[in-house]
Amino acid sequence: MAAETAQTSAPSTWRLGRLTVPLSIWLPLVIFALTRLYGFVVIALAARHQVALPSPAHPGIYQFAAHPSSPGYLGLITNWDGQWYERIATLGYHLPAVGDPHGKDALWAFAFPPLFPTVIGAMMTVTGLSFAVCVTVVNLLAGAAAMVVMFALIERTAGRFAAGTAVLFTSCFVAAPLFQAAYSEAIALLLVCTVLLLIARRRYCWAVVAVILLSLTRLVTPPLAIVVLVHAVVRYRGRTEDPIRRSEMVGMAVLGVVSLASVTLWSTITKVITSGVKATGADRGSVSNAVIVGRFGWFTNAYEHIGWIGVVGVALLVVLFVVVAISPVTRTWGVEVRTWFAIYPIFLLFVAGVHAGVFRYFLLAFPLALLLVGSPEREDIPRKRAIFVVAASVISLALQVPWVSHALVVTALAGKPWLP
């Protein structure tokens, strides 16, 4: 065993003049900065192959601001959903006038929750900077903060090695370039990690605020209700040694209800704004709408393409996530991280279809990275596992090249492009 592990040797602090920065801050920031620099190079090189947009070869791709061919880094990061966010940041949400030829676009914009484009739009107004520059600043700041919070969340129970692994692999994940593109993933990850950390620290009222903000960013709050439930059960079981105050009971109950119900917050607001206009896209991708139309994500896709064998296979995946979550492999992760590890991918299996865009959904499934290391002792760095983590991260970085080239870039090649 001694030959396989080594004591941590990284400096616990980093001095910048008179400022002392702890490892829990500088390490995730350095990892995020270096990987985003790599992402800049990958995106900038891939931009050379982008066609001019809008393009008659791709009539189904919405384009708010026309781009020339080879638009450069700042042009490429605003592709796809970024065009809808640019529209909202520039024009806001509004109802179309009667006879407006672009009326469907105005209504479809309601499909995108408001927090991310509102922040970008406010920055554009205050600074006068372009949409792409504001996106870069906001997402890099949000992504960096997300990594610091993620590190703190995991380090508290699993130690620095596990926390560093989660930050490293998440930053190197195949879809991680979206942390610097015009997508809401960076803010969403920051809010998810913040909610989990606040629950772990029993700051339930602040967690409610973070959940509401998350519901206005991405429709992923229902799994957090399960996290709150499991957290409450664990606290109830240990109430003899750790009594639960009445205010904490109320806080957990409110947090659970808000987590479950807030997934409909934006669609409810939209219905009020549109006053019954049926053409709005606000329910696109929502949990309730998926159930109403009889779509159950991977289960439906598996049945349509493989039959009941496929459904059974997806069901076994659900069981596998639960089994791993309660196994010794995850024993040091903390109940909140263990629960999110299982319930968020299960949530995706039920509500997200099988398509190339699923890679970006898994950016929020950051505990999956911990499977690379399991639950080592807090103060140890298992050498073999460390090598495995580095190798997996390098491979993932390499895979970013084809992913960006095929998913983020719109090329002149025939056929339907991948979706980021």
Where are these regions (language model features)?
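Start-transfer (signal-anchor) and selected internal transmembrane alpha helices
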Residues: 1-66, 251-255, 385-391
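Membrane-interface transmembrane helices that cradle and orient dolichyl/undecaprenyl
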Residues: 158, 195-206, 376
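Short hydrophobic/aromatic helix or loop-helix immediately within or flanking a transmembrane segment
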Residues: 76-98, 102-128
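Transmembrane-helix motifs of polytopic, lipid-linked glycan transferases
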Residues: 120-125, 134-157, 322-324
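Transmembrane-helix signature of polytopic, membrane-embedded enzymes
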Residues: 129-134, 150-172, 190, 339
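Short acidic/glycine- and proline-prone juxtamembrane loop motifs at membrane-interface regions
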Residues: 181-187, 358-359
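Membrane-lumen/periplasm interface segments of specific transmembrane helices
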Residues: 35-56, 214, 221-342, 399-407
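Signature aromatic-anchored transmembrane alpha helix within multi-pass, membrane-resident enzymes
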Residues: 253-260, 378-411, 418-419
